[in-house]
Design a protein with these regions (language model features):
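Outer-membrane beta-barrel proteins
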Residues: 2-181
Length: 181
């Protein structure tokens, strides 16, 4: 619990320094008998230069029916290269997953492509995530596609669909709001 409090405090402190903050709501539907959940996420991002961005975030999961809680705290680094309206990116991240019965570290790698036309940006990516210790059974592959619309230069809304396979099987519908500073 102390680690969760420290991570949350670090995230809130980071809000004062972030170039953008994203709030996201997720409706996760379990596949093949897996439980549904309602999730909320907050992420703070800061550009290091034109190619590199760092982020820190936390996601809270609430399982339908049981109301069991789990949390993922994660930090990542994204490299991106724009080529006209098309961009390619690769994100690497590490984090901790907390539940009422376990706590373990994990890593993820996500390559993808973006395409921007005016205020609309489409994104397609593939994420591989696994626990540092294979015994924790957290190996997943996520195929994702999303679109965002820049309402103003500082405000954007987005929608994303994720399909997760592996040790977890689900799909989710995700709505987000991003405020840039």
């Amino acid at each position: 619990m102390k680690k969760l409090a420290i991570a949350t405090l670090a995230l809130v402190t980071g809000l004062a320094f972030g170039a953008s903050v994203t709030l996201e709501g997720q409706n996760q539907i379990g596949d093949h008998g897996a439980a549904d959940s309602t999730n909320s996420q907050i992420t703070v991002r800061e550009s290091l230069n034109k190619m590199l961005t760092v982020d820190v975030g936390t996601t809270q999961y609430t399982t339908a029916g049981t109301h069991a809680l789990s949390t993922r705290d994660e930090a990542g680094l994204t490299a991106s290269v724009p080529v006209g309206p098309v961009g390619v990116y690769a994100r690497v991240a590490a984090g901790d997953k907390f539940t009422n019965t376990t706590h373990f570290g994990y890593y993820s790698v996500e390559p993808g492509v973006t395409y921007t036309v005016g205020a609309v940006t489409a994104k397609v990516g593939f994420r591989f995530r696994d626990a540092f210790n294979e015994a924790n059974l957290d190996a997943t592959r996520t195929t994702r596609a999303g679109v965002s619309y820049a309402i103003t230069k500082k405000d954007a809304v987005g929608f994303r669909f994720d399909r997760v396979t592996g040790d977890s099987t689900n799909h989710s519908l995700n709505l987000s709001y991003t405020r840039s500073f």
